[in-house]
Amino acid sequence: METPPRHRDGPVRTTLVAIGLAAFGILASQFTVLPAFVLDPALATAPADASLVSRTVLLILNFLGFVIAGGIYLAGTDRGWSYVDVRLPSKRGWLYVLAGILGSFVFYVLVTLIVQTLALPSAENQVSMYIGNDQTMVLIMIGIVFFFNAPAEEFLFRNIVQKRLYAAFDRLTAVVVASAIFALIHILSYALFADSLLATLVPITVVFGGSIIFGLLYAKT
């Protein structure tokens, strides 16, 4: 993806801006979920026992924060929505998409095998406390990931953060830096449920690796 013709920034400033964007997305999410807590206060005390509707609303609103943060950045920097890449991939692009999907599947299978073989501890994500053992919520979460999670994260971390890093880095370096930022913002959500540092690092490594794959896919398509 090509970026608009703007001057190249220094790597430090560009990285700080990218980190700020990610942090802004997380901060915005803390406010966008507030209506869900008003709808069902049980979300704050016993998340797994809250109503199905309120849990669904909360998880959807959480990702809305990323979209709002990205939109504010685009407006504040006069980049506008034309800065966002929204188009169907070319025939070659679809091949990259298929390769990315296959690559991510193989990556997660290999990581799972390594974790199981070495008996490595791995913390649950904070989202798990809203799902609990509710199989219906598991199915709903799959839909949320597909329709809200993935689009929101791709919008903020690929279309904006990663592209912003192009101003100071080559494509590959930008992908690595964006993936590192993406992994870092997930630390707290895993650390809250981890029994050890290793239990936090294992899923964070998985997040980083998966982000590398999708970052490369975005850069190629």
What are these regions (language model features)?
Residues 1-94, 102, 108-121, 213:
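N-terminal, membrane-interfacial amphipathic/helix-forming hydrophobic leader that caps
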Residues 81, 158, 162, 211-215:
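Interfacial helix-capping/hinge residues at the ends of transmembrane alpha-helices
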Residues 127-187:
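Function-critical hydrophobic alpha-helical transmembrane segments in multi-pass membrane proteins
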Residues 169-221:
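Functionally important transmembrane alpha-helices
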